Design a protein with these regions (language model features):
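Histidine/cysteine-enriched polar flanking segments
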Residues: 1-421
Length: 421
């Protein structure tokens, strides 16, 4: 640990966190430590992995989906994963009487989500709200570790910001200092990032097995050597029931502490989502996003990520999420929209998808790497061009031909389709 400035002669309560986000706690964190912005302010991780493998998996039918989600490294008061603690330190307090005592606690909305541990010689000890620090302890300066029991789900509930309050009481004298922290946002991956794992469902459908074989071959040609990871579900649409993201917190020397997150689509009756709980492990959590039943607009096929960019003076270093809204009856559930609004770092772009039956943005827009100033380009479905192909076929005398060759597709001719306004 780096030394902090020596304590003044007169008693002063001082608490620091990694406000400047350099992965260390020292005097450089003193400025604006009670403020929090996109550029400055201490970060906490929602410690939702399963380091010891103590949580049950999706095959345990005695547990509900909510119970499976509830088990993680922060679901009790033990330090299961201290590597993901945010460092907090108090400056030594001198000039106190032997009867003086101190407290450290999270205050304000959401305080119950914050866990605080104190580092003792024998290891980390959970520090409850009613525990007191002795005058002797206060005189030495102390180290704490802080994490969160949960992610940020909705600003209407909690925006993830918390205040740690350090209070020293010596008779009638009360000294107080504060530092502001916020739970790390869940950031969605974009298509410029290098893949290190590729997931596919385990399906018995011949057409899906063929797809998996083709995908495996394409990955091999691209130089991807890791084996395909499997979801234990026959739901073919992995893109629809899960989106992957991560939370990160600065560590020393430019490194970062990262917890990966599998985000279940807000379709609680879509059973495939339960299979995600098998992924939970060290530094890997699974979260549910609420929702109601199984509505297509809440599929994560209706979610993409614009890669990082700058435009008109605005910067989006983590990119932006993009989803579709088809209006009454086909709009995403409020749990869906609230979740992505609450993260703050990937300001959503909303597109009109009312012209689509399924109303998913991934049906007509994708973002691809490109050799240009942005490093990416947009692939957009050209619907007018498709109609022009049909009109040309009609003009060439093929109006009676079937539009679709698949036997389960709508049976209509080119003439019928073009006449349907």
């Amino acid at each position: 640990e780096e030394p902090l400035t020596a304590a003044p002669v007169e008693p002063v309560a001082t608490i620091f966190a990694d406000t400047n986000r350099d992965g260390r706690v020292n005097d450089l964190d003193a400025e604006d430590k009670t403020d929090w912005s996109a550029e400055r302010g201490a970060i906490i991780l929602a410690n939702i992995g399963d380091t010891a493998g103590r949580c049950a998996g999706p095959d345990d039918d005695s547990l509900s989906d909510d119970e499976l989600e509830a088990c993680n490294d922060a679901s009790d008061d033990l330090p299961h994963a201290p590597d993901y603690f945010a460092p907090v330190r108090t400056l030594s307090v001198s000039g106190l009487s032997d009867d003086a005592f101190g407290t450290v606690a999270a205050v304000g909305v959401g305080y119950e989500n914050i866990r605080i541990f104190i580092r003792r010689e024998e290891g980390w000890e959970y520090f409850t709200r009613d525990m007191q620090l002795s005058a002797e302890e206060l005189s030495t300066g102390l180290t704490f570790g802080v994490d969160s029991r949960d992610i940020i789900r909705s600003e209407d509930i909690w925006n993830g910001v918390t205040t740690l309050e350090f209070t020293v009481t010596d008779g009638a004298d009360v000294l107080t200092d504060r530092v502001t922290m916020r739970v790390a946002p869940v950031v969605i991956h974009n298509h410029l990032e290098r893949a290190n794992e590729v997931y596919v469902p385990q399906s018995d459908l011949p057409v899906h097995r063929e797809f998996v074989e083709d995908l495996s071959g394409a990955l091999t040609e691209a130089g991807f050597t890791a084996p395909l990871a499997r979801f234990d579900t026959i739901d073919n649409w992995a893109q629809d029931f899960v989106e992957f993201g991560y939370m990160s917190m600065p560590a020393p020397d430019g490194e970062a502490k990262i917890i990966r997150v599998a985000i279940r689509s807000p379709q609680p009756t879509r059973s495939a989502g339960r299979s995600l709980f098998a992924l939970k492990g060290p530094g890997f959590g699974v979260v549910q996003t609420g929702g109601d039943n199984y509505h297509q607009a809440d599929s994560f096929g209706n979610l993409e990520t614009i890669p990082p960019y700058e435009l008109d003076g605005a910067s989006y270093p983590a990119g932006r999420v993009i989803y579709g809204d088809a209006g009454d009856g086909y709009a995403p559930h409020s749990d869906f929209t609230n979740f992505f609004d609450a993260q703050w770092v990937q300001e959503p772009v909303v597109l009109d998808t009312s012209w689509l039956i399924i109303a998913h943005v991934d049906e007509f827009v994708q973002f691809l790497p490109a050799d240009n100033a942005y490093g990416w380009t947009i692939a957009i479905k050209d619907v007018p061009a498709a109609f022009e192909v049909l009109r040309e076929a009609q003009a060439a005398g093929h109006g009676e031909a079937q539009v679709f060759s698949h036997p389960e597709a709508p049976q209509m001719t080119i003439d019928e389709l073009l006449a349907d306004e």
